[in-house]
């Protein structure tokens, strides 16, 4: 059993997946936690974006983010194959709809979660590591704004592709409690109530 939450950065994927994994007894896999290993594998295989990613900051990578996820997807796919007998809830921006389509899973097993621009900016500012990413720039505020614009565009691209390919898409704006958003995601993913436990 495989369920996937893709979408764009800072949309609440990890929070929602964590809640659902506990509730539905699924193993929560964060692609972000696997990226370093996958980048190392892809770099060893001479994938161009992965080679560049080692030495570039996020602003320089804006145009390459989409291709970066395409480059590491064979490693994501390999990971999923190795763990196919486990009940997984995998989440991450690297689960691009056209790549997920290659897995030939039911469309209900994938959801695209993207934030409104305001939600994204608010929650990025709360992440403790963001200042460290920006500290080497000459204009941190402009660099942050460019980064946000890149991710806003990425959200639009991934949402449009999900809808085109027939996948469910949900936009988060922070107006409802996390557990309510989690219930909506569970409904869209058609998570089985027979596996559900109350927490």
What are the roles of these predicted feature ranges?
Residues 21-32:
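Post-Walker A helix-loop "phosphate-sensing" segment adjacent to the P-loop in P-loop NTPases
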Residues 10-11:
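ATP-binding Walker
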Residues 153-199:
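NTP-dependent small-molecule kinase module
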């Amino acid at each position: 059993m495989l369920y996937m939450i893709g979408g764009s950065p800072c949309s609440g994927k990890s929070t929602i997946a964590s809640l659902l994994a506990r509730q539905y007894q699924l193993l929560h896999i964060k692609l972000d936690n696997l990226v370093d290993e996958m980048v190392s594998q892809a770099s060893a295989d001479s994938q161009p974006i992965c080679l560049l990613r080692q030495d570039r900051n996020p602003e320089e990578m804006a145009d390459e983010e989409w291709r970066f996820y395409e480059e590491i997807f064979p490693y994501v796919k390999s990971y999923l194959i190795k763990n196919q007998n486990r009940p997984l809830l995998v989440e991450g921006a690297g689960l691009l709809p056209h790549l997920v389509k290659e897995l030939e899973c039911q469309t209900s097993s994938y959801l695209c979660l993207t934030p409104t621009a305001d939600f994204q900016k608010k929650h990025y500012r709360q992440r403790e590591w963001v200042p460290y990413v920006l500290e080497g720039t000459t204009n941190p505020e402009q660099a942050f704004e460019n980064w946000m614009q890149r991710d806003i565009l990425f959200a639009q691209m991934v949402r449009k592709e999900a809808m085109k390919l027939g996948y469910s898409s949900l936009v988060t704006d922070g107006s409802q409690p996390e557990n309510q958003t989690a219930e909506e995601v569970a409904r869209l993913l058609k998570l089985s109530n027979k596996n559900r436990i109350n927490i």
